[in-house]
Design a protein with these regions (language model features):
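Acyl-donor-binding surface of acyltransferase catalytic domains
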Residues: 38-40, 45-164
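Conserved acetyl-CoA-binding loop-helix of GNAT-fold acetyltransferases
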Residues: 70-80, 215, 225-235
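Short amphipathic alpha-helix that is part of the acyltransferase structural core
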Residues: 1-26, 134-135, 139-183
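Intrinsically disordered, low-complexity, positively charged segments
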Residues: 19-39
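A conserved beta-strand-loop-helix scaffold within acyl/acetyltransferase catalytic domains
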Residues: 181-221
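Exposed alpha-helical structural elements
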Residues: 10-14, 27-28, 71-76, 99, ...
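A short helix-loop-beta-strand connector motif used in the catalytic cores of GNAT acetyltransferases and
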Residues: 33-49, 182-191, 213
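A short, sequence-level motif marking secondary-structure junctions
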Residues: 12, 55-59, 207-208
């Protein structure tokens, strides 16, 4: 089986021109390629890479470029299936262009499961589950109207410092999107909503590129369903 090749960090720039042609949300992949966070980049050929598989440490991945059947049938297939120790943790994979979807469906065959629209859980015996990612459009005017109704002055906020960076618990937290606290303080920003001196919810920039950013948000379990997510993201 042909191998996938792990690209060295000092060669990540070779993955950027093809990424600029990707029209779906790709800031997480760009963060890896531009060395904002330590991830991995697999390619079809080290000397002249055309196909790229970028893995963000949070577990998001993007397959893009000139994807030939040979690359799909390389170690990439075993990687997707979690075989031979090539992938040890779960990933959320997106592909571009969209016609790759049919090729991957055929590649994985009976190993591919789907999320049932009736709410039934997917078949646990399937190593790969096909799902959908929904992206929302930000409408500044609607946001401004909603923000006025939140009365932010009634709440206690604190900008995320180095100590908080390390101690905020949960799944979507700054330490899973940035290499370190100092890096986050220099290039990102985030706030926590405090209740009785305790962190109830946090919102932060998970990726920042040019004039774009993506927000990450986490609420502590005991403070959920109280509207704190809307409040902290508005801050």
């Amino acid at each position: 089986m042909p191998p996938m090749h792990l690209l060295e960090r000092n060669k990540y720039a070779s993955a950027l021109p093809a990424l600029k042609k990707v029209s779906i949300n790709n800031l997480f992949a760009r963060s890896v390629i531009e060395n904002h966070v330590r991830g991995r980049v697999f390619v079809d050929d080290i000397a002249r890479p055309r196909a790229f598989y970028v893995v963000h440490p949070y577990g998001m991945s993007l397959l893009y470029g000139d994807i030939k059947d040979g690359f799909l049938k390389s170690e990439l297939r075993d990687y997707l299936l979690g075989k031979n120790g090539l992938r040890e943790t779960g990933e959320f994979l997106q592909v571009f262009p969209s016609n790759l979807e049919e090729k991957i469906d055929a590649l994985l065959g009976r190993s591919l499961g789907t999320v049932e629209e009736n709410g039934k859980p997917p078949d646990p015996s399937r190593p790969v589950i096909k799902h959908k990612r929904i992206n929302f459009r930000f409408v500044p005017k609607k946001y401004a109207r909603a923000r006025k109704d939140l009365n932010l002055k009634a709440h206690d906020f604190k900008r995320i410092d180095e100590n908080m960076f390390s101690n905020i618990s949960g799944s979507v937290v700054p330490k899973k999107f940035w290499d370190g606290a100092s890096d986050f303080r220099q290039k990102g920003i985030g706030f926590s909503l405090l209740k009785n001196g305790r962190i109830a919810a946090s919102s932060f920039s998970s990726f920042v590129h040019d004039n774009m950013l993506e927000l990450g948000m986490e609420t502590e379990p005991e403070f959920r369903r109280k509207g704190f997510a809307s409040i902290i993201t508005a801050k």
